Amino acid sequence: MQRIIGTEVEYGISSPSDPTANPILTSTQAVLAYAAAAGIQRAKRTRWDYEVESPLRDARGFDLSRSSGPPPIVDADEVGAANMILTNGARLYVDHAHPEYSAPECTDPMDAVIWDKAGERVMEAAARHVASVPGAAKLQLYKNNVDGKGASYGSHENYLMSRQTPFSAVIAGLTPFMVSRQVVTGSGRVGIGPSGDEPGFQLSQRADYIEVEVGLETTLKRGIINTRDEPHADADKYRRLHVIIGDANLAETSTYLKLGTTSLVLDLIEEGVDLSDLALARPVHAVHVISRDPSLRATVALADGRELTALALQRIYLDRVAKLVDSRDPDPRASHVIETWANVLDLLERDPMECAEILDWPAKLRLLEGFRQRENLTWQAPRLHLVDLQYSDVRLDKGLYNRLVARGSMKRLVTEQQVLDAVENPPTDTRAYFRGECLRRFGADIAAASWDSVIFDLGGDSLVRIPTLEPLRGSKAHVGALLDSVDSAVELVEQLTN
């Protein structure tokens, strides 16, 4: 089981002492405070390389950027001020008025959990550093997807796929899976509808914002399947599946299964396994129906007339994935995902609350029901919306999820030391290692970087771009000895270009 995967999370942000504060400003303060605490001067801060970005290229074969007029002029100084690349290979920046942490590329879902969790520690530290700045208002950051006022912000997943797989097969095979997986991956939400005005509890924070089956947009008319075709790799060989339907998860089992099961279902699709019998009659409607039924008993209509629950759909995918994995050479990583997936589905079938120590939405629902019973509250009570928000607070001593972990009421898959190491260090088995180590060792000599290149400024007449189009190259095994053998960026570039 080896697929390049990673997460990118826009964090909710607020300034309790100044509710009217501009979120772009406060998000910028968070990023800059983290950079300052890391001792990175603005003049030496590595910028993001936008030259290779193509967010309007569509996997269905067209490019909206060609018909939208000349590209906007980006002020590198203005953007770069709140845009940094970390020594762990991640990107920390301001996106749509939110601080965003884009994790480095991983090959294993458990590693992806570690570097995703590292983002929570980065954001917690950023808010703490802002509070230490004289005159700056305190900030609170939340790993969630809704602001309670009708807006949603993203927690996206990325999966590298073979370009040879027709995108139509991706849409057909993945749609029923994405619709049904929220029984495992939902983070839970108080309120129904985009603004949360209707009282109740639902599985997913993202479900009410899904409007179409397939689409390019990520901020409006959001699709179950996103069609952005921006591989950040060799475009002749790869496509990057950009998933926007998912929730921001804190529970490590939720994150692990979100990434691991999706990766294995993509194996099915790439192998050409026929999944057409799982087509849904009304996929967008099914997203909403499943999210709004915490009992997990609601059924959705398939195109062939059958009615199945989300758990039943997940079991069909599980069985087909297990059959594929059994036909291959032994793969302990894939087997562990399958075992965990099967166990979670069994628990959910028996009683969803049996997953309250491992999945987000049951954990949150258990907390909320406790408040409701103790204080005789209805789902309309504002207090419950506050509990919902506090669950996602990234502060280790205040966030309700983190407090559950501290008292042993939430099970972890990884150790805190692994997470803290990942805050500083990149994964060793992808190009993120080369990017992160270059930043650590030669940061002052790097002008810019992106997922697929590192650009050096060695004082000559021109910059030197080192492409990293193969995500599995640039690993420690590939370049570790080279990096250890050179004393300067000049030597490194000479070795690489010669």
UniProtKB/Swiss-Prot annotation:
Pfam family of the protein (one): Pup_ligase
Pathway: Protein degradation; proteasomal Pup-dependent pathway
Annotated Mg(2+) 1 binding sites: E8, Y93, E100
Catalytic activity: [prokaryotic ubiquitin-like protein]-C-terminal-L-glutamine + H2O = [prokaryotic ubiquitin-like protein]-C-terminal-L-glutamate + NH4(+)
Function description: Specifically catalyzes the deamidation of the C-terminal glutamine of the prokaryotic ubiquitin-like protein Pup to glutamate, thereby rendering Pup competent for conjugation. Probably also displays depupylase (DPUP) activity, removing conjugated Pup from target proteins; thus may be involved in the recycling of Pup and may function similarly to deubiquitinases (DUBs) in eukaryotes to prevent or promote proteasomal degradation of certain proteins.
Other known facts: Is the only enzyme acting as a deamidase of Pup during pupylation.
Designated name of the protein: Pup deamidase/depupylase
Native source organism of the sequence: Mycolicibacterium smegmatis (strain ATCC 700084 / mc(2)155)
Name of the gene encoding the protein in the UniProt record: dop
